[in-house]
Amino acid sequence: MSTNQIILTDQGNNYVNVWSHVAQDLYNHYGETLYNSWFSKVNFIESSLNTVILCAPTNFVRDWIKSKYSMVILQLFQHYNNTIKSIEIITKELPGTTQTVTELPTKTFADIGSSELNSENIFSTLDVRFTFDNFVVGAPNELAYAAARAVAESSGAVSESNPLFLYGGVGLGKTHLMHAIGWYIKQHNPSRKVIYMSAEKFMYQFVKALRNKEVISFKEKFRSVDVLMIDDIQFICGKDSTQEEFFHTFNTLIDNNRQMVISCDRSPSDLDNIEDRIKSRLGWGLVADVHSTTYELRLGILESKIEQMNVKIPKDVIDFLASKIVSNVRELEGALNKVIAHSNFTLKEITLENTQNILRDLLRSNERIITVEDIQKKVASRYNIKLSDMSSSRRLREVARPRQIAMYLSKALTPKSLADIGKKFGKKDHTTVMHAIKKVEELLENDIELREEIHLLMKILQN
């Protein structure tokens, strides 16, 4: 037998064991329904030249797993054995060499007792997709990314960003960065004790410790770690006992030069129903805002995701998704997955028209409601005039022209009548608004610079 080909030798058996662990991780992360649909009938075949070969039951399952999950499976294998460089999925089994993982214990994170949560099993709480390598950096998140990276690379020392407080809307990358910190430390400093969990689970385990009279054990566990990461800290707002425990845990860790990373949907100063002493401490280190995505960042995220999934998507479809799915990264990636899944299931080509039909309901919910007030603020800012000038009767050209442009955009981008628009501009009548719109339309016929300016304003307002 060639030394490069391993078919259930001792090392081969080790690969079988690794596949068992990988399958368990897939089950824990994706849940029973999805696991049973895609992974339960996948077999380990062999390993050859640092490539793991798996067998899927059908061509369809093989193609679906390859397009959507191959990178995840490879990263999981590499976590347990870093000599593995690639995976191959086939549909023809080799006799006598398979290991099927169909029945798995149903133990999930919720079943992990307090004594089990330590640096050895942080992996079970981390998403393999969320690493620094696949985090797309842009202007809205570059500070948060740099700070998270500094925390991860601190090599046992506490970073200057302690605590690191990440805040921003849903699906913008806060959790991704926290998982990335955990992965980096796990891979480069495995001796460091790290805990990552949501504030809800922190509360759940605290209540459980109170009920089981294990509070001392709870305190020792959380106050002896090197890095504590708590996601969605806003969950403890209004929960006095949990806040008290968190406060003392926070103080102990900071006093002992241990790193804390916290995420929230708002800044510390905007938190309600939380003690001032906690609010103050949350702002001690670096507070980094993760802003809403820009078109350029969304484009980068889509291109990165498409490359990872090894699929081909027409450029006009990518541009369409980046322009229309503006709420958050989670919805953007979900829309892309839906388009790819529809194509795989129906065997239809991915086209702009098909994409628009597939995402019709999602696009409707993502349509941004633009108000006259939004337009006034944006135009006033663009032309460096006071917002109050929008409602004034000043006839100076540097004031009147932006006001006319704002009226034009209000008619183009909102469902308001001319009379309603006039009311927003200092109770002007509909004929004044009509005159302003007509004036701008006349200028647009010959003024290329103005045409580009209004096009830019429209794009900014819509995105």
UniProtKB/Swiss-Prot annotation:
Keywords: ATP-binding, Cytoplasm, DNA replication, DNA-binding, Lipid-binding, Nucleotide-binding
Record organism: Rickettsia africae (strain ESF-5)
InterPro entries membership: AAA+_ATPase, Chromosome_initiator_DnaA, Chromosome_initiator_DnaA-like, Chromosome_initiator_DnaA_CS, DnaA_C, DnaA_dom, DnaA_N_dom, DnaA_N_sf
Domain-related comment: Domain I is involved in oligomerization and binding regulators, domain II is flexibile and of varying length in different bacteria, domain III forms the AAA+ region, while domain IV binds dsDNA.
SUPFAM superfamilies per UniProt: P-loop containing nucleoside triphosphate hydrolases (SSF52540), TrpR-like (SSF48295)
Record flagged with keyword Kinase: no
Function: Plays an essential role in the initiation and regulation of chromosomal replication. ATP-DnaA binds to the origin of replication (oriC) to initiate formation of the DNA replication initiation complex once per cell cycle. Binds the DnaA box (a 9 base pair repeat at the origin) and separates the double-stranded (ds)DNA. Forms a right-handed helical filament on oriC DNA; dsDNA binds to the exterior of the filament while single-stranded (ss)DNA is stabiized in the filament's interior.
The keyword Cell wall biogenesis/degradation belongs to this UniProt entry's keyword annotation: no
Gene3D superfamilies referenced in this protein's UniProt entry, alphabetically: 1.10.1750.10, 1.10.8.60, 3.30.300.180, P-loop containing nucleotide triphosphate hydrolases
Cellular component GO terms held in the UniProt record: cytoplasm; plasma membrane
Disulfide bonds, paired cysteine numbers: none
Residues annotated for ATP binding in this entry: 171, 173-175
The protein, known as: Chromosomal replication initiator protein DnaA
MF GO annotations: ATP binding; ATP hydrolysis activity; DNA replication origin binding; lipid binding
